[in-house]
């Protein structure tokens, strides 16, 4: 038997203690199964009931804690609706405080979206009927209450909203919801030992140390061997994610925010600011387990060090471990080139009617040195027009617009290729970004659109502006 020095014994003891102390999901063998939000597939005339209420969830294993959600479930159901249908919404607020809701990315008038101007008081209902006219996309709904959107969204008032059309279902893409078409809602949180969400309303920005995906920490999912589609939403308040696979495998970026790209883009990494969505395809024909992560690959010792540290890093940066099973898929031996029909690149040749510049001061939560004033209109745009907006910020931050859509023209002076251009409503500002904004929906003084920081902590401090489109 080998002699063990006192120093080695101490190190071994500390390591063993650490292993017993860390959260179970840090150990791959104990990962929970990914929860898939319930699917509400609406058809013409079928109402969509969304009851905002208290409920319970297990954010930590074996600990039930009070959260918020819809229809008795933490987070909301995924709404799937077809283009040219009508969304017959029925919001009901069963919470003890008033709430305003936004459907981010939905192309409709200010009166139908509601947004910050439509506060639902306790026990109040609202039932707008919204025509769905836009191309296939992955949108999301969340609380947007003035000065309280971050807290309410953090508690669980959010969900996915998927739009399809006849053409998008014939493209050969994975489309079995929860099987090979997987929704991933990313949230970072701070919890106490009982699993209760911790939140400070007046802190500058919110960076939680634990990463949750559909309400689960570092989950896994057994999927069919073959091509898998991941729809990823950054629903965090402030944190930006750097998505990649832990084996550095290539994936195909096919869509972002408001629709498909002209053609699939081969990537190893993609950045995702708050409110941004991407759809990616990953080939799992090799049958090997692989994890989608944020940042760089870590070992168990790295995770343990982050668990005992306080550096703003996530304890575990695993988003989802994919465990493929079954026979190889149809794409095993041929390279698929994905082409999609989108009019987004045509905006590059459209006449620009006005140019504007917006600078976000992250430290002071201002846009062009101003905070939100409900009595002041910050942008008045003409219906049907196209404007060029130049966006900059004092430090990296997400930006979002409601009721309109845009394409990214250039990033830090470098123009995007036409094949990379798709419709968006949210973007990361890291330096200077030029976007072309198209206004196809009306808003009014009573129901204005908003634009500004997609970081809801900053938005609650007034880092947004009001927009009239007539």
From Swiss-Prot:
Q: Which InterPro entries match?
A: Cu-oxidase-like_N, Cu-oxidase_fam, Cupredoxin, FtsP, TAT_signal
What function does this protein fulfil? Answer: Cell division protein that is required for growth during stress conditions. May be involved in protecting or stabilizing the divisomal assembly under conditions of stress.
Q: What is its main location?
A: periplasm
Q: What is the lineage of its organism?
A: Bacteria, Pseudomonadati, Pseudomonadota, Gammaproteobacteria, Pasteurellales
* One GO CC annotation: cell division site
Which protein are we looking at?
Cell division protein FtsP
Gene responsible for this protein: ftsP
Query: What GO molecular function terms would the record report?
Result: copper ion binding
GO term, biological process aspect, one: FtsZ-dependent cytokinesis
């Amino acid at each position: 038997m080998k002699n063990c020095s006192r120093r080695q014994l101490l190190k071994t003891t500390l390591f063993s203690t650490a292993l017993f102390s860390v959260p179970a999901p840090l150990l791959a063998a104990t990962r929970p199964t990914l929860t898939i939000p319930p699917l509400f597939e609406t058809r013409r005339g079928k109402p969509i009931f969304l009851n905002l209420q208290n409920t319970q969830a297990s954010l930590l294993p074996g600990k039930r804690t009070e959260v918020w959600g819809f229809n008795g479930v933490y987070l909301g159901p995924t709404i799937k609706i077809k283009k040219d249908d009508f969304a017959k919404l029925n919001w009901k607020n069963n919470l003890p405080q008033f709430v305003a809701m936004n459907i981010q990315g939905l192309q409709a008038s200010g009166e139908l979206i509601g947004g910050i101007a439509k506060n639902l008081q306790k026990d109040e209902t609202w039932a707008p009927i919204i025509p769905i006219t836009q191309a296939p996309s992955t949108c999301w709904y969340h609380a947007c209450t003035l000065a309280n959107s971050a807290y309410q969204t953090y508690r669980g008032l959010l969900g996915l909203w998927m739009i399809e059309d006849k053409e998008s279902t014939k493209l050969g893409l994975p489309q079995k919801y929860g099987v090979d078409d997987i929704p991933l809602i990313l949230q970072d949180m701070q919890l106490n030992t009982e699993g209760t969400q911790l939140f400070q309303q007046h802190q500058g920005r919110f960076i939680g140390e634990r990463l949750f995906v559909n309400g689960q920490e570092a989950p896994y999912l057994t999927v069919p061997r073959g091509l898998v589609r991941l729809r990823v939403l950054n629903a965090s308040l402030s944190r930006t994610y750097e998505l990649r696979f832990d084996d550095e495998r290539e994936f195909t970026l096919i869509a972002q925010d408001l629709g498909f790209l002209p053609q699939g883009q081969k990537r190893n990494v993609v950045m995702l600011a708050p409110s941004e969505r991407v759809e990616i395809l990953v080939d799992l024909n090799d049958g090997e387990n692989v994890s989608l992560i944020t940042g760089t690959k870590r070992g168990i010792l790295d995770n343990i060090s982050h668990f005992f540290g306080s550096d703003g890093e996530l304890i575990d940066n695993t988003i989802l471990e994919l465990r493929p099973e079954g026979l190889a898929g149809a794409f095993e031996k041929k390279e698929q080139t994905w082409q999609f029909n989108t009019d987004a690149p045509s905006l590059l040749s459209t006449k620009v009617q006005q140019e504007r510049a917006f600078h976000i001061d992250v430290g002071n939560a201002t846009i062009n040195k101003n905070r939100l004033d409900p009595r002041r209109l910050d942008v008045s745009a003409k219906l049907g027009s196209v404007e060029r907006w130049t966006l900059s910020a004092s430090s990296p931050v997400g930006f979002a617009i409601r009721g309109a859509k845009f394409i990214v023209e250039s990033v830090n002076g470098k123009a995007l290729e036409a094949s990379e251009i798709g419709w968006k409503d949210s973007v990361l500002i890291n330096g200077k970004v030029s976007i072309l904004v198209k206004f196809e929906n009306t808003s009014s003084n009573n129901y204005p659109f908003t634009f500004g920081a997609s970081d809801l902590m900053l938005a609650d401090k007034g880092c947004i502006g009001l927009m009239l489109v007539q």
